[in-house]
């Protein structure tokens, strides 16, 4: 998504815990001649509330405002019966997939209110819209994602130029998909680049006024 947004003129802020991976994306964006990105190492699993506020202050000083926020970080957690999931594993999934997403969103809202056209995209899942056995904490976290999106969208409706929507990527050629379905041929699934149209639509001005909706990328 970052490379696609950059190719359409966005100045992308790459936030995540694996700096080496972020640098690879940064280099690809630079090599393509797109607007210079920024790398922000940040561990969503261990970050405390005050660190999200400090991040927002840093970004305000560096960039002034935020026009778009894509929540794309998730961990799968154990795929097993609920009774067999440890409290530690459940809380870890909820921390990355829900708590950190909430704190990052609320920290960024003041910067997004400075934009005349701002968009928040929450990455959901089919198991966040209909529960399925053995999807455990991941399914619960994606239901929470949809709930956060809907609640925030209703609060923003008519009060802000910010819109919030969710996207279910569907079966995509990712490492998480391979972990969830180890026997599946990944070549049967589209790449991330192939499901970008809905993300571009929601992040761009064409979706102004579209708020509180759940989209499927496929």
Language-model features: where?
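Active-site helix of classical SDR
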Residues: 105, 141
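Substrate-binding pocket helix/loop in short-chain dehydrogenase/reductase
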Residues: 55, 80-82, 89-91
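Active-site-adjacent segment of SDR/Rossmann-fold oxidoreductases
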Residues: 130, 151-162
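C-terminal helical subdomain
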Residues: 158, 162, 166-167, 174, ...
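Canonical Rossmann dinucleotide-binding motif of NAD(H)/NADP(H)-dependent dehydrogenases/reductases
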Residues: 1-13, 17
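Residue(s) in the substrate-gating loop at a strand-loop-helix junction
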Residues: 125
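Rossmann-fold cofactor-recognition segment
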Residues: 32-48
């Amino acid at each position: 998504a970052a490379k696609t947004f950059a190719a359409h003129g966005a100045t992308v802020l790459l936030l995540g815990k694996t700096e080496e991976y972020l640098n690879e994306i940064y280099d690809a964006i630079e090599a393509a001649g797109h607007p210079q990105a920024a790398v922000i190492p940040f561990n969503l699993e261990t970050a405390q509330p005050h660190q999200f506020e400090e991040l927002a202050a840093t970004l305000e000083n560096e960039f002034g405002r935020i026009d778009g926020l894509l929540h794309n970080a998730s961990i799968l957690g154990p795929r097993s019966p609920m009774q067999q999931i440890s409290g530690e594993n459940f809380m870890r999934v909820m921390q990355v997939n829900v708590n950190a997403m909430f704190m990052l969103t609320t920290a960024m809202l003041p910067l997004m209110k400075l934009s005349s056209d701002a968009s928040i995209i929450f990455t959901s899942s089919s198991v966040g819209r209909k529960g399925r056995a053995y999807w455990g904490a991941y399914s619960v976290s994606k239901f929470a994602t949809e709930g956060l999106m809907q609640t925030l969208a209703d609060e923003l409706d008519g009060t802000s130029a910010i819109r919030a929507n969710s996207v279910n990527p569907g079966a995509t050629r990712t490492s998480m998909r391979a972990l969830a379905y180890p026997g599946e041929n990944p070549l049967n699934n589209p790449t991330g680049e192939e499901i970008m149209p809905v993300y571009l639509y929601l992040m761009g001005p064409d979706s102004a006024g579209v708020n509180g909706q759940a989209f499927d990328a496929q």
